[in-house]
Curated annotation (Swiss-Prot):
PROSITE patterns assigned: ACTININ_1, ACTININ_2, CH, EF_HAND_1, EF_HAND_2
Protein name: Plastin-3
Gene Ontology CC entries for this record: actin filament; actin filament bundle; cytoplasm
UniProt keyword annotations, A-Z: Actin-binding, Calcium, Cytoplasm, Metal-binding, Phosphoprotein, Repeat
Domain EF-hand: 8-43, 48-83
Residue ranges annotated for the Calponin-homology (CH) domain, each copy included: 119-235, 263-374, 393-503, 515-624
Organism: Danio rerio
TM stretches of this protein: none
Main location: cytoplasm
SUPFAM superfamilies in UniProt: Calponin-homology domain, CH-domain (SSF47576), EF-hand (SSF47473)
């Protein structure tokens, strides 16, 4: 499809696609198109905008999944090149607020393509990174960066800053011993970028359209897109009930803990802000864009959460509310940010970002406020079933991160709750090449108030039917009702088979369609180890010897000779700590040589057969690319 247009046009379209795809999941949906036209302030009547969006969705959404993929986006432009609709669409894209167009420097753009990115995001992310990594000796050669220049896009080029930011968002994701830090060469830089991208994927970032070369060249829209995902994961990490029980203070009358657990981090943040605004006697807000533009809600929020000096060792911080009555919106925003600075929270937004209602940066600003000063007390006297707050298991987190890394929409925050209408599962079927009849068999949101659950249940029934009839999964005793109920064991059984098939498909594509199963992988592993003169071998994915990670480390060294520093590898009689050290090194090294491993070090130490299988399968995929 893309072959009919020039490389330059294709690159330009990729930029445009990135501007419309607000949540960065690789697809455009109708509400993103609405937001685009709203932001662009084009002189078009409302009915005309609706007509254009309807036409774009009709023309572009070839597989009728209510989303436009990049390929579909390209075909729209080919089909609508000269029409009024295409012109309006292009105007909307080019007028999107806060977009800075720069002449590109890559080969694709040498003919004058414009790369576009948000200056506001660059400014915000640079300041956040400068603060976060200020005392890291490994980043001294890059920091502090000037937020008003392109320093950021150069700074990420060797992969070190990206690796460090990933570890700040999800500690211990990357074993520091595997980051190349000294005397960097093009090869060792490539390894760092592999490590960063594969680790970002493992924590749930959608990196399908980003390659190491894009980062080395510092392509602004791709760098900012990846950084936002990494930063957001870190900001949202504790906005979750099992990690922060005081959030139960946000329960409303008649609600259970389960109701609260279904909310996304964004929804919880909004509820948190409104909880404090209500206590201040101020009207509630419905978003972090339009409703905060006048800064008044922020003034009240800061005043509510500022430490009152009533706890041991707590210093009182007084918020000066005099700026609240300032007539000028911009000056009022600046007064408010001066107060946020007293709390050490002047991050992500400038006064202009507040006044313009930049949704992404205001969300980050509020998330940072929550993390520093939640000002919530865990309710003690209410009849709350705290037993529900177990938090997700490692396996559940791995599955969730795998789904999100593939760009499913909506983003999966809670594994069971977010799969109850099966839309994510149906998207995963498409990823494993099982066709989905989006037109005739799938109900899509918004669901009707009456009978909403029936519509979701129909989707779940269809998902199970596809698994049995088209994917040939083993789904004995699993029905649509189980997915709809969020039954953990049965939902996991289906999700595991989806992930397993996805992993095996990658291998079969590399091996010219030859069928792959566990025995084929074990055989390949042992043959590769033996040919490289290694003494380790595995009998199956339950083999207790795997707990030392020596077979994994040897296999990595067999695939990429001399990549493993054996001085760092513990041998002999190993304690659990030694095994974990080896496993951390093995998982990061696998990612560094180019294997997209989702499993965690603990999975190797405990020899979890499913996750162990994915590790060896991913390494086999990397080894087959070498052959």
């Amino acid at each position: 499809m893309a072959g009919k247009i020039s490389k330059e046009e294709l690159e330009e379209l990729r930029e445009a696609f990135g501007k419309v795809d607000l949540n960065g999941n690789g697809f455009i949906c109708d509400h993103e198109l609405h937001d685009l036209f709203k932001e662009a302030n084009l002189p078009l009547p409302g009915y005309k905008v609706r007509e254009i969006i309807q036409k774009l969705m009709e023309e572009g959404d070839k597989n009728k999944d209510n989303m436009i993929s990049f390929d579909e986006f390209v075909s729209i432009f080919q089909e609508l090149k000269s029409g009024d609709i295409a012109k309006s669409f292009r105007k909307a894209i080019n007028r999107k607020e806060g977009i800075l167009a720069i002449g590109g420097t890559s080969e694709l753009s040498s003919a004058g393509t414009q790369h576009s990115f948000s200056e506001e995001e660059r400014f915000a992310f640079v300041n956040w990174i400068n603060t976060a990594l200020e005392h890291d000796p490994d980043c001294k050669h890059k920091l502090p960066m000037n937020p008003n220049t392109d320093a950021l896009f150069k700074a990420v080029g060797d992969g070190i800053v990206l690796c460090k930011m990933i570890n700040l968002s999800v500690p211990d994701t990357i074993d520091e011993r595997t980051i190349n830090k000294k005397k960097l060469t093009p090869f060792t830089i490539q390894e760092n970028l592999n490590l960063a991208l594969n680790s970002a994927s493992a924590i749930g970032c959608h990196v399908v359209n980003i390659g190491a070369l894009d980062l080395r060249e510092g392509k602004p829209h791709l760098v900012l897109g990846l950084l936002w995902q990494i930063i957001k994961i870190g900001l949202f990490a504790d906005i979750e009930l099992s990690r922060n029980e005081a959030l139960a203070a946000l329960l409303r009358d008649g609600e259970t803990l389960e109701d609260l657990m279904k909310l996304s981090p964004e929804e919880l943040l909004l509820r948190w802000a409104n909880f404090h605004l209500e206590n201040a006697g101020w009207s509630k807000i419905n978003n972090f864009s339009h409703d905060i533009k006048d800064s008044r809600a922020y003034f009240h929020l800061l005043n509510q959460i500022a430490p009152k000096g009533q706890k041991d060792g707590e210093s009182r911080i007084d918020i000066d509310m005099s700026g609240f009555t300032e007539k000028d919106d911009l000056k009022r925003a600046e007064c408010m940010l001066l107060q946020a600075d007293k709390l050490g929270c002047r991050q992500f937004v400038t006064s202009t970002d507040v006044m313009s209602g930049n949704p992404k940066l205001n969300l980050a600003f509020v998330a940072n406020l929550f993390n520093k000063y939640p000002a919530l007390t865990k309710p003690e006297n209410q009849d709350i079933n705290w037993g529900l707050l177990e938090g997700e298991t490692r396996e559940e987190r791995t599955f969730r991160n795998w789904m999100n890394s593939l760009g499913v929409n909506p983003h999966v925050n809670h594994l069971y709750g977010d799969l109850q209408d099966a839309l994510v599962i149906l998207q995963l079927y498409e990823k494993i090449k099982v066709p989905v009849d989006w037109n005739n068999k799938v109900n899509k949101p918004p669901y009707p108030k009456l009978g909403a659950n029936m519509k979701k249940l129909e989707n779940c029934n269809y998902a199970v039917e596809l698994g049995k009839t088209k994917a040939n999964f083993s789904l004995v005793g699993i029905g649509g009702q189980d997915l709809n109920d969020g039954n953990p064991t049965l939902t996991l059984a289906l999700v595991w088979q989806l992930m397993r098939r996805y992993t095996l498909n990658v291998l079969e594509n590399l091996g010219d369609g030859q069928k792959v199963n566990d025995d084929v992988i074990v055989s390949w592993v042992n043959k590769t180890l033996s040919q490289a003169g290694k003494s380790t071998k595995i009998s199956n994915f339950k083999d207790k010897e795997i707990s030392s990670s020596l077979a994994v480390l040897d296999l990595i060294d067999a695939i990429q000779p001399s990549s493993i520093n054996y001085d760092l590898v513990k041998r002999g009689s190993l304690s659990d700590g030694d095994k974990l050290d080896n496993a951390k090194y093995a998982v990061s090294m696998a990612r560094k040589i180019g294997a997209r491993v989702y499993a965690l070090p603990e999975d190797l130490v405990e020899v979890k057969p499913k996750m162990v299988m994915t590790v060896f399968a991913c390494l086999m995929g990397r080894g087959m690319k070498r052959a």
